[in-house]
């Protein structure tokens, strides 16, 4: 009697497993009824995510592998993270991405605070500082300098160039003039700005085109 009950219980469990497998993998009950996308900053970037996600209405939810879909989407350089969820009750699949936020253009490409360089489909409309550098470390140093400058100063700057983190220079508008400022490294920013303003206030410097603040205690004007 015991063995008979055991066989019946085993058979019922097997039937249950097979039924669930069928329902999840082949039945039309648990299928994707809608797919939503969020987080992509432009229409073109959303289309790129949608193409790589490759999720179709009517597709079995059990066959939508979150890890594989996320891996495909993460091949887009501008993607920072991906989150995918499946609602087994209403059949909704949600694909949410977090885009990298650019803080500057680096050698013609967008770059975020982690130093990741990328291009965004559809472009980026907000104005960003333009940085040219030999390597990422130097580029990040130039960007950090820009971000530490007072707004009334930074809004007049352009074309940041960094040969190294210790050798940063840029252009700045002063009325109708454009001056080349050799800044050096990102240290002593407040003091360098004070020296810069003091130099411009001198009548004999009314026609200078270049200021070297590498050593703010011994500035050079030309």
Provide a role label for each language-model segment:
Residues 1-36, 43-60, 67-71, 75, ...:
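Charged, solvent-exposed interaction patches on well-folded alpha/beta domains
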């Amino acid at each position: 009697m015991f063995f008979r009950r055991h066989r019946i219980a085993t058979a019922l469990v097997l039937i249950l497993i097979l039924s669930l497998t069928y329902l999840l993998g082949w039945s039309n009950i648990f299928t994707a009824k809608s797919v939503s996308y969020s987080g992509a900053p432009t229409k073109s970037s959303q289309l790129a995510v949608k193409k790589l996600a490759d999720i179709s209405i009517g597709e079995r939810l059990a066959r939508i592998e979150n890890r594989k879909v996320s891996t495909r989407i993460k091949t887009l350089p501008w993607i920072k993270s991906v989150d995918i969820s499946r609602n087994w009750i209403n059949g909704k699949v949600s694909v949410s991405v977090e885009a990298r936020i650019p803080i500057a253009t680096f050698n013609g490409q967008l770059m975020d605070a982690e130093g990741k360089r990328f291009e965004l489909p559809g472009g980026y409309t907000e104005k960003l500082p333009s940085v040219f550098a030999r390597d990422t470390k130097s580029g990040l140093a130039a960007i950090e300098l820009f971000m530490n400058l007072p707004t009334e100063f930074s809004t007049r700057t352009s074309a940041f160039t960094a040969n190294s983190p210790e050798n940063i220079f840029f252009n700045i508008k002063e009325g109708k003039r454009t001056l080349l400022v050799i800044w050096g490294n990102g240290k002593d920013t407040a003091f360098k700005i004070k020296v810069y303003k003091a130099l411009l206030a001198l009548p004999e410097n009314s026609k200078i085109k270049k200021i070297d603040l590498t050593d703010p205690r011994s500035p050079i004007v030309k």
